[in-house]
Amino acid sequence: MVDFGALPPEINSARMYAGPGSASLVAAAKMWDSVASDLFSAASAFQSVVWGLTTGSWIGSSAGLMVAAASPYVAWMSVTAGQAELTAAQVRVAAAAYETAYGLTVPPPVIAENRAELMILIATNLLGQNTPAIAVNEAEYGEMWAQDAAAMFGYAAATATATEALLPFEDAPLITNPGGLLEQAVAVEEAIDTAAANQLMNNVPQALQQLAQPTKSIWPFDQLSELWKAISPHLSPLSNIVSMLNNHVSMTNSGVSMASTLHSMLKGFAPAAAQAVETAAQNGVQAMSSLGSQLGSSLGSSGLGAGVAANLGRAASVGSLSVPQAWAAANQAVTPAARALPLTSLTSAAQTAPGHMLGGLPLGQLTNSGGGFGGVSNALRMPPRAYVMPRVPAAG
């Protein structure tokens, strides 16, 4: 604790006059008054709303819990507002004490003047004539010392009394349950577990009912319908290819049938020619078999496993007929026997014909005019009869 009596008046007066004054204390008192007024207004409004709800539209146990939770907060606001108001009053007391101490404090210029006068008296006191004046000056300085000390002690006592009346502020009470968030999290987790358990209990009977039902088809009707829609656009080109194959097979069968008939006619009197016809027919059948294998490999082993591919305007021509490339290549190796040999003997034609005269082509070449077996008519022509039996009139 500072002993103001031990300090000279120069120090005490300088401290008092060098401070900010009472203006800061007055401003602080006004702010505390404003805080107190706001708290009183908030407490009054809060209390009015609470009582308005509980006495009017909201009645019940939940309303009672709300009042029990809100009442401590309203009380805290009221108490805090009173404390703020008291603080403002005490700050004003301190400001008044300062003004009193300031008025009692000797001004520093007066003290400085006294000290200057003392120095002059001492300097001119050659024969002791200034001794009474020096004593008076020292007495005045002593009074200044005592006055400043009394002012400072009075100010310290007044401010101490003002601060002792103040009460410490308290924190606002909790109006909610601190464990509410934890309890809410636990409740949510329990609700989720309960919902999952309920869903499981609902799904188990459904699963058992599905197991109890007869086994359904692996491919439902709608899936088969979608599969048919995907396949059906490719069936039309496939059917065209099959139709073309059937036409060529029919042509081959017709040619083979004609060759078989010709073979039967020539077998009796021209064995070599018959053998040539049979060989040509077998070659034609082998050519169609090779064509069928090529078509089957292009369509895939399953018939629908590979994509359908087609080209337009790429077929080769044999005469006026459009044929595959293999047939066109084979057609170049065909050498009609009638064009290569004279029409003197079928035996020589059969012996000199190539082994693969048809070269994998349909038997339509057998009907070429002026070639192939066009000379058969000459071989079958009967010589003129040596004797003609006359017709008997009695025979009718």
Curated annotation (Swiss-Prot):
Regions that span the bilayer: none
One Gene Ontology term from the biological process aspect of the record: response to host immune response
Entry superkingdom: Bacteria
Record-annotated disulphide pairs: none
InterPro entries: PPE_C, PPE_dom, PPE_sf
Record-stated family: Belongs to the mycobacterial PPE family.
Protein name as annotated: Uncharacterized PPE family protein PPE19
Organism: Mycobacterium tuberculosis (strain CDC 1551 / Oshkosh)
